[in-house]
Design a protein with these regions (language model features):
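General small-molecule cofactor/ligand-binding pocket signal
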Residues: 108, 165-169, 325
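N-terminal export signals
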Residues: 1-5, 10-33
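Conserved PLP-enzyme active-site core in the AAT-like
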Residues: 12-15, 19, 35-55, 59-67, ...
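Structural signature of PLP-dependent enzymes
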Residues: 290-313
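Generic N-terminal amphipathic, Lys/Arg-enriched alpha-helix
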Residues: 54-63, 74-81, 337-339
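Conserved C-terminal alpha-helix-loop-beta "cap" of PLP-dependent enzymes
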Residues: 317-417, 422
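Short glycine-rich or small-residue beta-strand-to-loop segments that form or flank ligand, phosphate
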Residues: 63, 78-81, 105-111, 147-149, ...
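Conserved N-terminal alpha-helix of the aminotransferase class I/II PLP-enzyme fold
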Residues: 70-112, 123
């Protein structure tokens, strides 16, 4: 009975994937005919340099160049590139527009979330005092300690480079007890109830709090939510879900702190954050990205993303022993995500093996697996994050960065890789 039931389930899965398999066969036939006629793959600006493009199922990782900009963003940057403008005036004007959109006191465009972290830290230490701005990263005579809620991260160098000293705290009680006359800021990437408690502590102790929610959009309402919660400063990456310029970010919050962050940043000569330059194109592009999100039908977009990973799911489920599930993370990168699992030990085929084979494909396919190629090895060895790391038991494919049509290529290739591994183990 078990064998019959298993065969029946396999047949049903194969039947569900039949239309997709037919599309793949037709596409392969066309590709072979094109090659026979001497029509090769289309060249692009990267291939002409000898750089291979990637089918990105991993998500908005910086080392894979983040996300793809909204068409509106590309057009806005093109228009912005045709004029000269005073950058301080532009940032303040954009700040007023960001305030209208979000309810925050003001905002500036930064060089990513890391740039926002640095600018916010400098603002809390030096304020708008030019003598202190020029003095950084020497913090003599300034409040210079930053309480790190939850401990260290791979990104805290953005805070340390301003001259700030990190003070690690892993609970609300530790945060409160860590605050003293030298405390300049509290940093957190916590959400929900934890964030509410931390906001309350910051208000009670009169210490500014910076929330780093780099991957917090979508939903775009988060840009308003943190203002409603009274978070002093909060930041988003421009090159992740926001779909703005990859080298941009948004720092929003109290008007006085945002002005101080601006004065500690480019274009001001002598400011510690001067190297973290953003151009007029990035400033306009990042603002346009946020405006575009407020006009976007998120339900429709999520439906499109779900369709893409559902096609991949139907194809890979035709391989015996493969199981799948779909979920949306609740702590950032909130996109429909496909989990694919198999018995690694029985197959003699690990998550790393699968990710490696997909990365060696033509075209290259990147998935979430066991590795992080962009991490400085010393960070891993130092284990700055207190969370226990477990060996992964699945790969993940993130829908948001899969371009329309690529799901068929991914589904076909992943199916072939898993089928070959299953047959070898059988």
């Amino acid at each position: 009975m078990t064998g019959n039931g298993s065969s029946r389930r396999s047949f049903v899965k194969l039947l569900a994937a039949a239309p997709l398999l037919s599309q793949i066969a037709a596409r392969d036939l066309y590709a072979n005919a094109s090659m026979a006629m001497g029509i090769g793959a289309k060249q692009n600006i990267y291939s002409r340099l000898g750089v291979k493009t990637v089918i990105n199922c991993r998500g908005t990782w910086t080392y894979l160049s983040g996300s793809l900009e909204f068409p509106e963003v590309r057009q806005a940057q093109l228009e912005a590139s045709e004029y000269f403008v005073n950058m301080l005036e532009l940032q303040r004007a954009v700040g007023r527009r960001l305030s209208e959109l979000t309810g925050a006191g003001s905002g500036i465009v930064t060089s990513g979330s890391a740039g926002a972290m640095a600018a916010a830290t400098a603002a809390c230490m030096a304020g708008t005092n030019d003598q202190l701005i020029w003095q950084l990263p020497d913090t003599t005579g300034m409040k210079h300690e930053v309480v790190m809620a939850g401990g260290r991260s791979a990104f805290d160098s953005a805070i340390r480079l301003t001259g700030a000293k990190l003070v690690l705290a892993h609970s609300p009680e530790e945060i409160a007890n860590s605050i003293n006359e030298n405390t300049a800021m509290i940093y957190t990437n916590d959400l929900g109830e934890k964030l509410e408690k931390e906001v309350a502590i910051s208000k009670d102790r009169k210490v500014p709090l910076l929330l780093d929610d780099a991957a917090g959009i979508p939903p775009v309402d988060n840009a308003k939510l943190y203002a409603r919660m009274g978070v002093d400063m909060y930041c988003f990456s421009g090159g992740k879900g926001l779909r703005g310029p990859q080298c941009s970010g948004l720092l929003l919050g109290r008007k006085d702190l945002i002005e101080a962050a601006l004065l500690n940043s480019s274009p001001r000569e002598g400011a510690v954050c001067r190297p973290m330059k953003v151009g007029k194109e990035e400033v306009i592009g990042c603002l346009t990205a946020l405006e575009t999100w407020f006009k976007t039908d998120e339900k429709k977009l999520y439906a499109e993303w779900n369709v893409r990973i559902d096609k991949i799911r139907k194809l890979v489920e035709t391989v015996p022993g493969v199981t799948t599930s779909t979920y949306v993370p609740d702590d950032g990168n909130r996109y429909p995500t496909l989990r694919v699992t198999w018995d690694q030990q029985a197959w003699g085929f690990s998550i790393s093996d699968c990710a490696r084979e997909l990365r060696a494909s033509d075209p290259i396919i990147e998935v979430l697996g066991a590795d992080n190629p962009s991490l400085v090895t010393a960070v891993r060895e130092g284990n700055p994050n207190s969370k226990v790391r477990k060996a992964p038991d699945h790969i993940e494919l993130v829908s948001m960065t899969i371009k329309p049509g690529e799901e068929m290529i991914v589904g076909q290739r992943l199916r072939a890789v898993l089928a070959a591994a299953w047959k070898k183990a059988a």
